[in-house]
């Protein structure tokens, strides 16, 4: 079939199932071929228009157009005029009274034929009053009605419903915003609050398409607009932010379109089985894992951008447009930052001209447990300065000092490290970290990207000293309490997988990175060696416990010989537990825990019986 800018085949003259099936085959073939030449935005609109024509034709075929008090209305994504190859087609049949037997039969035949055409159709038959009542009770129905579009039938009924939906009595801006934010938080919780699952859901994952839609829904409701573009004029978002959102949406749409084509169904989870074919269709090549890595890395970087914009814009809408922050108490933190409610806020738009103030902000977050996040105004500033950075933040002496202060802070691995990860500051600080952002892991164990796995390791390490978790791993809690320098443990967590994806032994390469870090940050020789050894040996204890007979004295002696002393054993044990537990939510079990504990206690006993190798105590005393 020749490629054209638009599908130009006429609808079948005879309304038979076979003729319409043939028409759909021709259109779907055109749609697949057009993907190589046209934007996805134009194609999802083309499918919506195609379905419009089919529905109107069938509506007339079943004589439904003769009933003057029925409207056929597209709602949801179809209402927006956007349909991916296998997307649901959501319809509202709006009536002004109860249907008679003839009307019910005609509608039944109409819907049945759509199902026979294998369309994913969801439909409801309601009056204006019923639609409004249900919309007031259910935020999902309310959202669908906000995006309704008349296909055919009574415009009078459609206008009446639209008038009711636009009223403040239907949903106030404040109530609608709160309901959509709660809905989003519940959805995010289903995905453990992360977009970095290796088989993500393109729609529902944090940072996915639903998060982009939520940004628009809350503002469209308030300003009574139809498109995201209109919101720039209302100063809800800047032109640059709008363009960035559209760029992110376009890439997620490309992936979703290709996924529907490859799976042949309304599939939004990009499972491992589909990833190679989708990567090939998107032009990332046909070289297996490498193609998938390139595609997924861009995906994870995209959803990170969306998640940050979503956080910033929803907060901005709540605080500045709904004015919820006008009465919040403000507290000065220093010359550069203040606390507005529970959010840290820069006092000056030029505050980040001094690069160390970026790290200073995160030190405040670690130091003040009342701070739960960053103010939207300050996120905007942070995004701007992040793009203009020349070199790495670790190049600045003042930044290095503050980074190590955060590492040494008792709460440095709490909210501060999470926000540094979320807002790209770890990547701006450590050049090696940038390489693992969105880095896939192709094995049977890891459920998350390298950077998200590492973030989870750090959170697990922090739990050893966190109030309320003393009974989770009491041995680790006791060890960390006695640790002279727990920051070495946290740094080992940061570097343990930092060389993945480069080729070669990631433990050895990461150990070299750790040595360079120690040198740059003026760690003592003892601390640098301990850090480098932990990174190089971070798999040693796990492999020994799970693949060797730990009840064999020779195995214990061999392991003790590699570990050398009880100090290293303590650090390695705590790191190993945190690492395994952050790999996969289903990987950890009591059996693995007991194996590691037995290996730890057996090796500790061996050291205390005199197998511990002598250390250079003079160096240790001199350096500490």
Q: Residue ranges of each PLM-predicted region?
A:
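Active-site flanking loop/helix segments enriched in acidic
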Residues: 34-47, 194-204, 343-347, 400-405, ...
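N-terminal regions immediately upstream of nucleotidyltransferase
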Residues: 1-68, 86, 193
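Conserved nucleotidyltransferase catalytic core and NTase-mimicking acidic/glycine-rich helix/loop elements
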Residues: 4, 10, 21, 170-321, ...
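Conserved catalytic core of two-metal-ion nucleotidyltransferases
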Residues: 48-56, 62-64, 101-157, 254, ...
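Alpha-helical phosphate/pyrophosphate-handling elements in metalloenzyme active cores
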Residues: 50-73, 218-233, 240, 447-489, ...
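A cross-family structural signal marking well-folded subdomains
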Residues: 317-431, 439, 608, 612-624
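Divalent metal-dependent catalytic cores for phosphoryl transfer on phosphate-bearing substrates
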Residues: 81-106, 233, 246-247, 253, ...
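Regulatory modules associated with amino-acid/nitrogen control
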Residues: 251-252, 292-343, 415, 423, ...
